[in-house]
């Protein structure tokens, strides 16, 4: 396989080993190249062209070897160049062999799963024009010596029929162990699995990895111990007791203290509920005297109102409680003043009963005036009514008035059965 640049100057040896960095090998003394030539770009071009030729020979839809894949994996390519002929003095590439370590789960002859990390043959290609000339065996044998591995210890990734014939012809690898993946292993693969890998192979691999990528391994992080999980039980009836909201009795019975005896052993709480506070009484504790006072001053029950509504007369206490404030109770309010009149707006809206009382008071005062005049003069009483101008109006009385007004108020209050003083 020919290239437009000088392959002989790029690869001084017949077999060149390339790692993931695709760097050109050390140059022989006396070899000169122009400074502008990008050697790494030439190596990437060679790898890409070899991958395309291998995919075409194996009838693969896409190449499995490329410069980009090489840079993202720790694989190794053994490149074989032709030193016999130098067309135009630039050299040519015969083929390549790509290998790498992979962690696999394979089955042994007893169909038991085994976790291994063998060296795998990932891609192998020799140009069609130089096949059957021993170039393939030369390249394969160089790889075995370099990696210090035996042919039966290898795992081959999707080998072609030509590769299987090649291994059978040169290394007597014929009997395979069936696997569930795309890798093929031969009989004798597990003969040395009970022993650790060859120290030289492992040391070579790790030393190569350290030189290629000298990055220290990250220290293992210790995870905290996992706490034991208890049984998660659903809510029981006892767990839900404290969540129940008590129904309050009708007023004023709800003002009475509810003395509930606390349980000796409270029900266990579920861990998912957290530390919820206990529900206290709905109302604070009310003393007995305050309870009796509230019962005495509380409004009547709707049932009692219904009974009083059906009774046309009702009880006297209820009538006194529900009817309007009489005149005599004005002295109990803040409207009373011994130096002036009281607020007449409180008496502005009278009813028929008030008018009736005023008329009776006027008649009685008139009769008393006649008795007093008869007692003072010794004459026969005359049924003459005092002029209205001499008697002050009933609604404009004052405590400092005459004796007649005081008597009228006294008689009126006795009739009302209430006393303001």
Curated annotation (Swiss-Prot):
Region of interest: Disordered: 214-235, 252-284, 342-398
Gene3D superfamilies: 3.40.630.30, 6.20.370.120
Reaction equation(s) it catalyzes: L-lysyl-[alpha-tubulin] + acetyl-CoA = N(6)-acetyl-L-lysyl-[alpha-tubulin] + CoA + H(+)
Superkingdom per UniProt: Eukaryota
InterPro entries: Atat, GNAT_ATAT
Positions of the record's site feature: Crucial for catalytic activity: 58
Modified residues (Phosphoserine): 272, 276, 315
Record-listed Omega-N-methylarginine modification sites: 323
Entry-linked Pfam families: Acetyltransf_16
GO BP, one annotated term: dentate gyrus development
Keywords, sorted A to Z: Acetylation, Acyltransferase, Cell junction, Cell projection, Coated pit, Cytoplasm, Cytoskeleton, Membrane, Methylation, Phosphoprotein, Transferase
Biased composition (Basic and acidic residues): 226-235, 352-367
Class of this enzyme: transferase
Signal sequence annotation: none
Subcellular location as annotated: Cytoplasm; Membrane, Clathrin-coated pit; Cell junction, Focal adhesion; Cell projection, Axon
Keyword match Acetylation: yes
Enzyme Commission (EC) number: 2.3.1.108
Residues the record lists as N6-acetyllysine modifications: 56, 146, 233, 244
Gene Ontology CC terms: axon; clathrin-coated pit; cytoplasm; focal adhesion; membrane; microtubule; microtubule bundle; mitotic spindle
Modified residues (Asymmetric dimethylarginine): 305
Record-linked PANTHER family: ALPHA-TUBULIN N-ACETYLTRANSFERASE 1
Family: Belongs to the acetyltransferase ATAT1 family.
Subunit details: Component of the BBSome complex. Interacts with AP2 alpha-adaptins, including AP2A2, but not with AP1 gamma-adaptin (AP1G1/AP1G2); this interaction is required for efficient alpha-tubulin acetylation, hence clathrin-coated pits are sites of microtubule acetylation.
Protein name, as recorded: Alpha-tubulin N-acetyltransferase 1
């Amino acid at each position: 396989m020919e290239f437009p640049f000088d392959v002989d100057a790029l690869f001084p040896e017949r077999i060149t080993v390339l790692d993931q960095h695709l760097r050109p090998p050390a140059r022989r003394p006396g070899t000169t190249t122009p400074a502008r030539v990008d050697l790494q770009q030439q190596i990437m071009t060679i790898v890409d062209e070899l991958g395309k030729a291998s995919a075409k020979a194996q009838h693969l839809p896409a190449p499995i070897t490329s410069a980009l894949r090489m840079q993202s994996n720790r694989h190794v390519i053994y490149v074989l160049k032709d030193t016999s002929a130098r067309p135009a003095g630039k050299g040519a590439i015969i083929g390549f062999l790509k290998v790498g370590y992979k962690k696999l789960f394979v089955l042994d002859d007893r169909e038991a799963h085994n976790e291994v990390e063998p060296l795998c043959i990932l891609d192998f290609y020799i140009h069609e024009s130089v096949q059957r000339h021993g170039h393939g065996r030369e390249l394969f044998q160089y790889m075995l010596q370099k990696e210090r591995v035996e042919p039966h210890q290898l795992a081959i990734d999707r080998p072609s029929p030509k590769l299987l014939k090649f291994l059978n012809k040169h290394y007597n690898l014929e009997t395979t162990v069936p696997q569930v993946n795309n890798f093929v292993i031969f009989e004798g693969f597990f003969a040395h699995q009970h022993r650790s890998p060859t120290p030289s192979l492992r040391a070579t691999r790790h030393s190569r990895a350290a030189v290629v990528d000298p990055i220290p391994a990250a220290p293992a992080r210790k995870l905290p111990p996992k706490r034991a999980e208890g049984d998660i039980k659903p809510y029981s009836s006892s767990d839900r007791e404290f969540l129940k909201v008590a129904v309050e009795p009708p007023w004023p019975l709800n003002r009475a203290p509810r003395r509930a005896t606390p349980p000796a052993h409270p029900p266990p709480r579920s861990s998912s509920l957290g530390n919820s506070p206990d529900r206290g009484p709905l109302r604070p504790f009310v003393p007995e005297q305050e309870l009796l006072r509230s019962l005495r001053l509380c409004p009547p029950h709707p049932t009692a109102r219904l009974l009083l509504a059906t009774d046309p007369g009702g009880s006297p206490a209820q009538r006194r409680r529900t009817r309007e404030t009489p005149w005599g109770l004005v002295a109990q309010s803040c409207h009373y003043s011994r130096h002036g009149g009281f607020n007449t707006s409180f008496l502005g809206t009278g009813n028929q009963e008030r008018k009736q009382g005023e008329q009776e008071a006027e008649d009685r005062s008139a009769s008393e005036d006649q008795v007093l005049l008869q007692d003072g003069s010794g004459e026969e009483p005359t049924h003459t009514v005092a002029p209205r101008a001499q008697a002050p109006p009933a609604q404009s009385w004052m405590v400092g008035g005459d004796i007649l007004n005081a008597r009228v108020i006294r008689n009126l209050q006795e009739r009302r059965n209430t006393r303001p003083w």
